[in-house]
Amino acid sequence: VLTGGDAVSLRTDFVTLTGRVPISGIKTFGSWYSRYQDWTAADYKNVIANYRANGFPLDVLVIDTKWRAAEDGTGYDIAANNFPDMRGFLADAHKSGVLTIFNDHTHQSSNSALSPTELKWHTENLQKILAMGLDGWWYDRNWKYALKSPYSEITPSTLGKVIYSDILTDYAGNDRIFLMVNADWDRNGTIESDPSVIGHRYGIQWTGDITSEALQLREELTNMVDMTAVGA
C-alpha cells in the first residue's frame, strides 16, 4: 500500500526512516564456535587446535559467562582458575587468526542505565577488558537483572544495545566495532513480539540458545528471513 507493492522501495524507505545496519568486520561473517561450557583457557586452545588440525575454518570464538569470577554471572573480575593469563590467552587466539568475544550480563542496580555512575562503570569495565585484547562484546539480555530504561517507549534490551555500541565505538575510534546483541523479538528461536524499529542498528542480532538439530536450524533460518522482511 505504501509503495504500490514495490518491496525494494518499501525497504529503502524503512531504512531511511529507522537507520542503516552497520557492517561488521569481514571475519564476523566466517565460522563461529559458541557453546556454554565451564572451560579453561587450555580447553579453548584445544578447540582452536582441533579445528585447524581437521582442516576446518574458525574465525570467531565465543566465550560465555564462565570467563568471569562472580557466581551470579555478572561483574568484570576474571575467573583466574579458568584464565590465569587472560592477556596471553587472547594474544594466542589472535596468533591463530581467531577473534574472541565475551558474553556480558548486566548487574543488579537501582540506578538508571543512563546515570553517570552506571555509564562510568560500564565504560571503564568493558574497555578495560578490550584493552587486554578482547575483540568484542556480546550484550546478553540478563534474565535475572536488567538495565533500567528511563524511557517507557524504549526497552531495557534496546537501550543496552545503544549504550554498548557507544562504549565500543568510543574505544575503537575509526575501526569497526564487534558487538553481538539479543534480538528483541526472539527468545531462543521462538518469535515472541514485533521487533524494535531501531534495534537492528546496533550489533549482530542473536536469537537465543538453540540445540544442534536440523529442525532448529530450519526454524532459525525461517525467523531470519521473516524478520528481515520487516526490518529486524
For the regions a language model picked out, list residue spans one by one.
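Catalytic-domain carbohydrate-binding cleft regions of carbohydrate-active enzymes
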Residues: 1-232
